Amino acid sequence: MKYILVIGDGMADEPVPELGGLTPLEYAKKPFIDELAAKGEVGNVLNVPDNLPAGSDTAIMSIFGCDPNLYYTGRAPLEAAATGIKLNPGDVAYRCNMVTLESGDLPFEEKRILSHSAGSIDGAVSDEIITELFSDPEFAAVAAKAGMTVNLGHSFRHIAVQSQADIKGISLIPPHDHLGEKIGPLLPTGCKNADTLRELMVKANELLERSPINAKLVADGKMPANGIWFWAEGTAVKLPDFVSKNHHTGAVVSAVPLCHGIAALVGLGIVCPEGATGEIDTNYENKMQATLDILEDNDLSLIHISEPTRRTPNSY
């Protein structure tokens, strides 16, 4: 038997008073989904254990048959696996967002976070800025002392790796949950290494405020990427092999590094069709064709649709 599994990431949402208490999914006109529901079997599943934060990382791990309570170490190691980053014992991976902070002469802690994605910065520009930052002698010296390197990611999402880092007790806060707030109470705390991360964030803001690339972004009416933000920390993770466990081969259709990483860790194939962006402008036709093509030689085709999360202001 052939299987197609569709993940509408964030599609369920929550009841909205303006929609008469319905969720966006309940309110939407969706004749094909309604027909499938009427003719098929419908049920409920808890993809995120009650004791863990709800997110694409924990939910998709569950969907792939990996209990987050047993295997989850953080989001960043999953994204790191997408690009083949190998974490050694003692290494810690962080998501390193390019963000937009208030400009001006305010003390660093008094600045507000204006965008967790630097205005959904273009990937090539984001790569150029983060490369410029880690190549700057001042910043490179601080990063080397911290044992930190950076790996280019997708759009505003980069992966930083710190060797021999002790993160016991550390508290790193997701930036997308605190837009418009002063960053002082949101900065890393909880252990000595938190001070190191804060030092890197302060130095990055100081240097990026002077970046000619950011000056051009501002001149073009765009948000500058004048800060970095560490979160989603975690250590190396090993997930059970999907094929050995379920006796089915398959592949994942997605443009999102998180999905690519989980797929790689469980031994499933990865397909990112032309035009698949992980954003609202993605090419659905190519994604669907890729889903069908996978089934020619496999049992399972999993298509991840991340666009519902992009319709919210807090996509991360």
Question: For each predicted feature, which ranges?
Answer:
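Extreme N-terminal starter segment of soluble prokaryotic enzymes
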Residues: 1-4
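Conserved active-site and cofactor/substrate-binding residues in soluble primary-metabolism enzymes
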Residues: 6, 28-31, 124-128, 195, ...
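Active-site nucleophile/metal-coordination loop of metallo-enzymes that catalyze phosphate/sulfate
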Residues: 12-138
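A residue-level signal for conserved active-site and pocket-lining positions in enzyme catalytic cores
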Residues: 36, 221, 303
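Glycine-rich, mobile lid/loop segments that gate access to catalytic sites or pores
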Residues: 117-227, 233-235
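Long, well-ordered mid-to-C-terminal structural blocks that present hydrophobic/aromatic surfaces
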Residues: 229, 234-302
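Single conserved hydrophobic/aromatic residue that forms the stacking wall/gate
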Residues: 304-316
